[in-house]
Design a protein with these regions (language model features):
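Glycine/proline-rich active-site loop of Rossmann-fold NAD(P)-dependent oxidoreductases
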Residues: 160-164, 190-199
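Conserved beta-loop-beta element that borders a ligand/cofactor-binding pocket
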Residues: 138-159
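N-terminal Rossmann-fold cofactor-binding loop
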Residues: 30-35, 50-51
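Substrate-positioning beta->alpha
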Residues: 133, 151, 178-188, 199
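NAD(P)-cofactor binding segment of oxidoreductase domains
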Residues: 69, 76-104, 132-136
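N-terminal Rossmann NAD(P)H-binding glycine-rich loop of SDR-like oxidoreductase domains
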Residues: 3-23
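Conserved Rossmann-fold cofactor-binding substructure of NAD(P)-dependent oxidoreductases
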Residues: 45-65
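SDR active-site strand-loop-helix element
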Residues: 6, 30, 70-71, 104-110, ...
Length: 205
């Protein structure tokens, strides 16, 4: 497959590249700063671009089988009002429509599930700006006719374990955390297998 990775310099995006290359896929990393990616591989193509730019995305996308988006906002901006993921989701789906690419796997967050309890209420308060941006991005994606999958993982860690559980429209039981690598594995699996089409998926270790 030819996979188009957005957010490729982040923790999850880096793991997506590693897993996809290990499975002999061709990977395009669409990033603002290609020099931040130290990995070199004949199957890896680095493309400099702005994820807000429909024009740049439309130029880079043709010929790919799927878009895997791990875009997110890092602290301290993550704890302030922002719309980055929503804006980039809008430009991405527009460019996909122009380019004839139909498959999208997007990372969101488990905080959007209506879980009960004080801990989840606290997370929803602390992560309210992230949640607002991600929910808006999800709405953008759902409004399209694309074959999308939205992944909602819980707290992410740097563990090397790539195992995960996936549940439609709910957080798996006893979900507390999972690794960036496991989220990346789910994304590549979903792209390869064509699973969870037009579905929201809760993830956990």
């Amino acid at each position: 497959m030819r996979l188009f990775v957005m957010g490729a310099t982040g923790h999850t995006g880096t793991q997506v590249i590693d897993i996809a290359l290990a499975r002999s896929h061709d990977v395009t990393a669409f990033v603002r700063s290609p020099q931040k990616i130290l990995r070199r591989d004949p199957r890896l193509k680095l493309v400099a671009g702005d994820p807000h730019s429909i024009e740049q995305l439309t130029k880079a996308l043709p010929g790919h089988d799927a878009v895997l988006s791990a875009l997110g906002v890092r602290p301290p901006q993550a704890f302030r009002p922002h719309t980055l993921v929503e804006e980039c989701a809008a430009s991405t789906v527009a460019a996909m429509g122009e380019s004839g690419v139909n498959r999208l796997v997007l990372v969101s967050a488990a905080v959007l599930f209506p879980q009960k309890g004080m801990l989840f209420a606290l997370f929803r308060t602390l992560l309210r700006h992230i949640a607002r941006d991600l929910r808006a991005a999800e709405d953008v994606v759902r409004s399209t006719s694309l074959h999308w999958t939205i992944a909602r993982p819980p707290r992410l860690t740097n563990a090397s374990d790539g195992a995960y559980r996936a549940v439609r429209d709910a957080l798996p039981a006893k979900a507390s955390s999972m690794s960036f690598r496991a989220v990346a594995a789910f994304m590549v699996d979903a792209a390869e297998q064509g699973t969870f089409i037009r579905e929201t998926v809760g993830l956990a270790r």
